[in-house]
Amino acid sequence: MGISFSIPFDPCVNKVSQWLDMKGSYTHNLEKNLVALETTMEELKAKRDDLLRRLKREEDRGLQRLSEFQVWLNRVATVEDIIITLLRDRDVEIQRLCLCRFCSKNLTTSYRYGKSVFLRLREVEKLKGEVFGVITEQASTSAFEERPLQPTIVGQKKMLDKAWKHLMEDGTGIMGMYGMGGVGKTTLLTQLFNMFNKDKCGFDIGIWVVVSQEVNVEKIQDEIAQKLGLGGHEWTQRDISQKGVHLFNFLKNKKFVLFLDDLWDKVELANIGVPDPRTQKGCKLAFTSRSLNVCTSMGDEEPMEVQCLEENVAFDLFQKKVGQKTLGSDPGIPQLARIVAKKCCGLPLALNVIGETMSCKRTIQEWRNAIHVLNSYAAEFIGMEDKILPLLKYSYDNLKGEHVKSSLLYCALYPEDAKIRKEDLIEHWICEEIIDGSEGIEKAEDKGYDIIGSLVRASLLMECVDLKGKSSVIMHDVVREMALWIASELGIQKEAFIVRAGVGVREIPKVKNWNVVRRMSLMGNKIHHLVGSYECMELTTLLLGEGEYGSIWRWSEIKTISSEFFNCMPKLAVLDLSHNQSLFELPEEISNLVSLKYLNLSHTGIRHLSKGIQELKKIIHLNLEHTSKLESIDGISSLHNLKVLKLYGSRLPWDLNTVKELETLEHLEILTTTIDPRAKQFLSSHRLMSRSRLLQIFGSNIFSPDRQLESLSVSTDKLREFEIMCCSISEIKMGGICNFLSLVDVTIYNCEGLRELTFLIFAPKLRSLSVVDAKDLEDIINEEKACEGEDSGIVPFPELKYLNLDDLPKLKNIYRRPLPFLCLEKITIGECPNLRKLPLDSRSGKQGENGCIIHYKDSRWLKGVKWADEATKKRFLPSCEHRLERCETIFED
């Protein structure tokens, strides 16, 4: 009988069954779960896409997505990536299954895969089941946030008030402010921004963006978005175009003020996504730039110039920076402080930096030394090289082209505060080959004026007129120091540019290494004798002439030049010896200047062209104007490449040989001359007349028969300035309709017999007309002779700016009917007792705040004026000003 026993199987079977139900289903139901996962994921994606389209519509209205919804989107994106991987491995995993999918060739792998499919299916179903009634909210923005501000610049209150008033005008959508670096533009813009912070003025948002040199559209968009509360992960996923659309849709329903600081180039508002404030009612754009060009390109045709401070205001700012303790430490310091402050020329940046530097200097010696450093080489002054000059250098670096940069550096050769004639600058640039003159002088001049315009618009030069009314520019002292610093390779090679202009030196300065000197300016000094030889192998420009300082003109005093002085200057291209009145001759050794292209001997005592000058074969520009002792120019025909010859005011006797010799100069393009009425050989020379840019006919003795000139026929389209003085002449004949297309300035003085000036009808570009002491003149434009012009549709004086009439006892008529005079700024009437009617009506003359004014000498004349109508009288009578001084032409001797 054997032993019997029993084992209970039910618990084991239950455990296996539970495992198969829970774990085995991962593999057994894999195919079914995969189908369900794929279907449910497609439904989830459809729901997500529907919500994203809704989101875009709401964000385009300026709403901001909820963080909760963004978390849901992120979870959908994460699970989608996982499911893509799972579905990619589907076929491989199904093929592993066996025994009716209850088993697998690799049980562990199939189990893990099946479990992952099951869990993802549950997650997708959960995500799909979430409901979003709201997915966005209003973006949270701060209307204005006050910006930190440097202490208000003394003296800018008036400018700030003007800017605020202009910006707040209903018609102002865009306002630009321009000026040189360091003048206070950013301070002014910040003050405007903070004024909006205090008084919102009905605006929803104020936005401040610093743009700087490299315009980065996306960077600007990001800064605006951050201000508007539109940033975040979703913002960074957009490209520039999408960001622009988003910003535009947000801002188009807002009243905003956008402040852009430090623009160097035009910024396309449309590309950024900013609605145009000129068409978006109630919106404003205010910006700063160093460039007038940028302001106009941004849409502000009349931007506000931020100028340097006036002298007294500048000194107030300087005193604040220095401090009363330092100013009161020695009785002599305040006077020296004013000298130092003046060196800053009203530039707030320089006043602040130099004022802070001097705030601890409490001895006379320290202040005197500061003045010495600023006068000799200002870049060495503490704070200049690290705080002032680099800031200004940004403007230099932003200039387009090396020729423009070189042109600016050239201006630093002139004295401080000098009024530099544009014409002189351009002549030097051409002969130094900064400007290409191969296509002719006039085209090169046009390039030069374009360069000057770009430098003015970049706030690196300022336009003005000199003492003789010539168009000129001034270089701010601090800009000049910056240019000298750059020219010296940032202070490394200080002797590259030797500039001692107008400082009273009596001899050539001492230089350690003459071989590195490229340009030297000793204008307006007290050097009497140029002696010795200097090895200036790289010297290209040597300026030894005059200089104009504000309202003062300083002449040079050179009397003699030694024979060896020019021996070692093989590259010298520009030599200016003008205004050395006691210089009567040049050494024959001037012929050693084998590269010389420009020679200025105007206002010197030169009597003739030396043999040495005749051997200057490369010379293209020779200036002999106002050489009152010049007896002949024999030998000038040897200067085969001469293109510009200036003889105005030279009193050169014009004989037949002189005319013939000049006619042999085949490359001559420009001629300026003074002739006497007898010089008929010159007047009959078509070659010389056609090249004349300035022609003066001057009778030397009013009682001499030599001054008789029965009639004059001038036919040249190059003539720009025309003067007739001290002559008896009955008529200036009219030529063809294109005779005087370039004529801009006409002066007639002390001429008998002349009854009318109808030839002027053929001068459409005439800007200045001065007629003084013409006893027989009856008409400016004679009615009968003008008929020919009127038949051609000509309206006289379309560009006339200045009209000066004096000592004309018989003058009755300027023109028989009113003229537009669109450019007319000033009429001056002296002794003209019979001139009772002016050719004006209520629409004539320059309009606006600086409209046409009338100066008159005799109050009886004004009482007798017959105005065209009451409207004309109302328009011009308030602008009439009584002037007692004699109205007469000023001309150079």
From Swiss-Prot:
Repeat positions for LRR: 516-537, 538-559, 571-593, 595-617, 618-640, 641-663
Gene Ontology cellular component list: nucleus
Molecular function (Gene Ontology), one example: ADP binding
GO biological process, one term: defense response
InterPro entries registered for this protein in UniProt: Apaf_helical, LRR_dom_sf, LRR_R13L4/SHOC2-like, NB-ARC, P-loop_NTPase, Plant_NBS-LRR, WH-like_DNA-bd_sf
Residue span, NB-ARC domain: 136-440
Keywords of the record: ATP-binding, Coiled coil, Leucine-rich repeat, Nucleotide-binding, Plant defense, Repeat
Pfam families, sorted: LRR_14 (PF23598), NB-ARC (PF00931), WH_DRP (PF23559)
Record flagged with keyword RNA-binding: no
Chain residues that bind ATP: G179, M180, G181, G182, V183, G184, K185, T186
Highest taxon listed in the record's lineage: Eukaryota
Coiled coil, from the record: 24-68
Main function: Probable disease resistance protein.
UniProt remark on domains: The LRR repeats probably act as specificity determinant of pathogen recognition.
Similarity comment: family membership: Belongs to the disease resistance NB-LRR family.
Name by which UniProt lists this protein: Probable disease resistance protein At1g62630
Native source species: Arabidopsis thaliana
